Amino acid sequence: MCGIAGLIHRGKSSNVGNELQAMLQALKHRGPDSTGYALYADNDGENFIMRFKVGENVGEGSSSVNEDESVYDKRKELVDDMLKNLGAKVLKEEKLTPYSYRYEMKYDDDLMDFSKKIESIESVEILSIGKSLELIKDLGDAQAVLDRYDLGKVTGTHAIGHARMATESGVDIKSAHPFWGYPFSDVSVVHNGQLTNYWNNRRAVSYTHLTLPTICSV
């Protein structure tokens, strides 16, 4: 089933976090497993915002394997080392949950190579990179995710979101929507329904430079 919501404010900014929450909460009956927000926020536009995770939420309903939080800390250290090697300068970092982070950083090189190297670290996934886009997704309904990540304060111009009922893959953050439009900054994609020719398309895409991290990727 699942549910998709979106909004846009032309020529002005608004509290897109709360507005999208209200829309997605109304769709909870269509997707109770996980919720995702792709918010185009009022950032300064000078630096990249990278949201990434170093593990999964293993709470109630999760299909992920439980891990000790010390593993998350070690993966985060590996990410920091890789960022230094890539020449990225982290200006600000926030630990949002035991398994997810938000970094503000300067980076002037190729995002494809950057992303491949960051995600070569075990269980590390970049959720989004952009100067406006901030992609947040986790288990639970829209209110739970909004509260967990303090999204009620986020202002911006537009947003899309997704309430998911898992049918083709596990209940985890990795399979939740929306997806970052790798390797392009500030691009997010969400889809609904089942593609009947999915595996044919996946095979075709596998011959290109694009990566397909989940069986929900298109």
Where are these regions (language model features)?
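Single conserved hydrophobic/aromatic residue that forms the stacking wall/gate
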Residues: 209-218
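Conserved short alpha-helical segments that host acidic/polar catalytic motifs at enzyme active sites
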Residues: 1-210
